[in-house]
C-alpha cells in the first residue's frame, strides 16, 4: 500500500495496526468503536466494522457488517454477510450469500460457550445463531442453526430458496451425513434436542427428529411427513419413506423398510427391533410385530 492512498474511514489511528499490510480499501467502508484490524487483513466494499471487533492475519471482509465483539482470524473470508456478537471465526472458513451469524450466550446451560465457525467450514445463505458450532469440512446452505447445534466432519446441510433446514438444541450432523430440504410445501427437515444424523445417512424432506434419535450407517429417511421420537435408532441400509411415525424405543437395521403409500400413515410404536429384510407398509396390529 502506497503512503497517502485514500482508504475507508476510521475513528482513531489505533484501528489499523502499523505492522503488516492491513487496509480498508473502499472509501465507503468504516471501522470504529474499538475495532482493531491487523496482519494482512483486507476490508473491501461497503463494509462496516464496529464494537470491539478484532480482525487479523489474512482475513478478507467484503461488503459485510461485523460487530459487537466478533473475533475473525487466520484465512477467513466473509462476503456480503452479517456477523455480530462474541464469536470466533477462524481457519479457512467461508461465510457468504447474505448469511447472518448472530452470537448470544446465556440462552443454554453452557453459559460460556462461544459460537464458532472454523476449519474449512462453508456457510452460505444461512442463519447461525446463539452458540452453534460449524467446523471441519462441513457445508451449510440455506439453513437455520441455533442453540448448541453442531455440524462437522464432512456433513452437508442443503436447504434451498423455498425451504431451510432447521437444527436446534443440541442436535448434531456429522460424518458424511446429508440433510436436505425439498421444494414442496413444508419439506423442511427439523432436528431437535440431542438427535444425531451421522456416518453416511441421508435425511430429506418433511422429517422431524425429536428426542434421542440416531440415524446412521447408510440409512435413508425421506418424508413425509416423518416423525421420529423417543429413542429411535435407524442404521444399516434401512429406509423410511412416506408418512411415517416411529416412536418409543424402536430400532431399524439391516435392510428393513418402513414405507407409507399415498394417503396412508404408518405408525410404529416400540419397544421393537425391525431388521433383516423386513418390510412394513401399514400400521402393525398390537402384538403382531
Place the predicted regions along the sequence by residue.
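LRR N-terminal entry segment and analogous cap-like coil->beta motifs
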Residues: 5-38, 42-44, 50
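Glycine-rich hexapeptide-repeat left-handed beta-helix
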Residues: 39-289
Amino acid at each position: 500500500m502506497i503512503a497517502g492512498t485514500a482508504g475507508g474511514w476510521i475513528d482513531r489511528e489505533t484501528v489499523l495496526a502499523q505492522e503488516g499490510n492491513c487496509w480498508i480499501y473502499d472509501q465507503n467502508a468504516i471501522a470504529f468503536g474499538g475495532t482493531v484490524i491487523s496482519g494482512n487483513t483486507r476490508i473491501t466494499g461497503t463494509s462496516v466494522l464496529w464494537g470491539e471487533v478484532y480482525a487479523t492475519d489474512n482475513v478478507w471482509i467484503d461488503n459485510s457488517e461485523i460487530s459487537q465483539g466478533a473475533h475473525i482470524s487466520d484465512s477467513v473470508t466473509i462476503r456480503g454477510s452479517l456477523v455480530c456478537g462474541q464469536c470466533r471465526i477462524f481457519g479457512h472458513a467461508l461465510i457468504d450469500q447474505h448469511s447472518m451469524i448472530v452470537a448470544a450466550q446465556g440462552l443454554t446451560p453452557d453459559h460460556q460457550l462461544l459460537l464458532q465457525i472454523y476449519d474449512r467450514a462453508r456457510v452460505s445463505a444461512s442463519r447461525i445463531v446463539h452458540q452453534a458450532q460449524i467446523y471441519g469440512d462441513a457445508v451449510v446452505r440455506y439453513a437455520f442453526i441455533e442453540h448448541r447445534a453442531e455440524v462437522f466432519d464432512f456433513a452437508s446441510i442443503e436447504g434451498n430458496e423455498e425451504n431451510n433446514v432447521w437444527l436446534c438444541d443440541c442436535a448434531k450432523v456429522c460424518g458424511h451425513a446429508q440433510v436436505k430440504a425439498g421444494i414442496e410445501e413444508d419439506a423442511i427437515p427439523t432436528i431437535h434436542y440431542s438427535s444425531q444424523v451421522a456416518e453416511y445417512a441421508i435425511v430429506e424432506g418433511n422429517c422431524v427428529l425429536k428426542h434421542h434419535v440416531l440415524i446412521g450407517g447408510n440409512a435413508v429417511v425421506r418424508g413425509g411427513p416423518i416423525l421420529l421420537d423417543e429413542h429411535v435408532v435407524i442404521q444399516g441400509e434401512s429406509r423410511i419413506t412416506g408418512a411415517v411415525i416411529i416412536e418409543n424405543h424402536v430400532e431399524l437395521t439391516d435392510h428393513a423398510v418402513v414405507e407409507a403409500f399415498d394417503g396412508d400413515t404408518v405408525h410404529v410404536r416400540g419397544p421393537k427391533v425391525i431388521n433383516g429384510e423386513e418390510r412394513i407398509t401399514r400400521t402393525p396390529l398390537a402384538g403382531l410385530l
